[in-house]
Amino acid sequence: MSHASDPKKAGAHGDKSLVVEHLRKEYVRGKAVLKDISFTVSGQSTTAIIGPSGTGKSTLLRCINRLIEPTAGRILVSGEDVCALKGTALREARRRIGMVFQEYNLVERLSVMENVLCGRLGYISPWRAWLRKFPQEDIDRAFDLLDMVGLADFARARADELSGGQRQRVGIARAVMQEPHILLADEPTSSLDPKTSVEIMELLRAVAEKRDIPVLVNIHDVTLGRRFSDRVIGMCKGEVLFDDVPSALQDDHLKQIYGGEEWLQ
């Protein structure tokens, strides 16, 4: 099954799309961490990226949201090449890229509500941001999102009072608060117990469907990735070795991606 990059096709979903074309990343010249990565995601889809540790999965997501600079290639978010942007234009483009982090990245001393409202910082003036003065419509939207993630009763609680699963729910609400065109999740379940991991993946899939945006999840748990995704991208040593629907992912593919058979036992 082919998933070739096609910006025109991606734009057919209200321009909420991500197109990665021939992406390459080198930290040391001549030694690529990402090698010629190309794919397109659009619409209300959930895509799982699997592969061994150190294979470039997190680097890929960090290139997409420009936390790090790609060495070559293009990354189009809603048809705009974010690799070509700088300054104000880049900051505005990054509003459209929601990010859920492995370690939550919450401001521990702030309340749950204040952390969710941080998702609007790119939309308000610097003085409003400094004083944490948000429009009432943003506050109303934040309450709605806390209800969506099951934390309506925790709005005034400090972030450092929450469990890991609750913190990740806040992180998801904060990312959705940006009104992103795409949502990236970097190992969102790696620090969570099995039950909470399932709940977080269910929530991410619900975000894709309810917000009509593509969700791209870097995940270490192959079973979870298969269960909650519409598509699986398998990576090894900076290259894409598999790109298809979950039902097509067989043990032979997993041996190729992860190397050897021991881990299948």
From Swiss-Prot:
Binding site for ATP: G51, P52, S53, G54, T55, G56, K57, S58
Membrane-related topology note: Peripheral membrane protein
GO MF terms held by the record: ABC-type phosphonate transporter activity; ATP binding; ATP hydrolysis activity
Catalysed reactions, as listed in the record: phosphonate(out) + ATP + H2O = phosphonate(in) + ADP + phosphate + H(+)
Gene3D superfamilies named among the record's database cross-references: P-loop containing nucleotide triphosphate hydrolases
InterPro entries with a match to the protein in the record: AAA+_ATPase, ABC_transporter-like_ATP-bd, ABC_transporter-like_CS, ABC_transpr_PhnC, MetN_ABC_transporter-like, P-loop_NTPase
Keywords: ATP-binding, Cell inner membrane, Cell membrane, Membrane, Nucleotide-binding, Phosphonate transport, Translocase, Transport
Family annotation (CDD domains): ABC_PhnC_transporter
Major location (coarse): membrane
Family membership: Belongs to the ABC transporter superfamily. Phosphonates importer (TC 3.A.1.9.1) family.
NCBIfam families xref list: ABC_phnC (TIGR02315)
Subunit structure of this chain's protein: The complex is composed of two ATP-binding proteins (PhnC), two transmembrane proteins (PhnE) and a solute-binding protein (PhnD).
Name this polypeptide is given: Phosphonates import ATP-binding protein PhnC
Species assigned in the record: Nitratidesulfovibrio vulgaris (strain ATCC 29579 / DSM 644 / CCUG 34227 / NCIMB 8303 / VKM B-1760 / Hildenborough) (Desulfovibrio vulgaris)
Gene: phnC
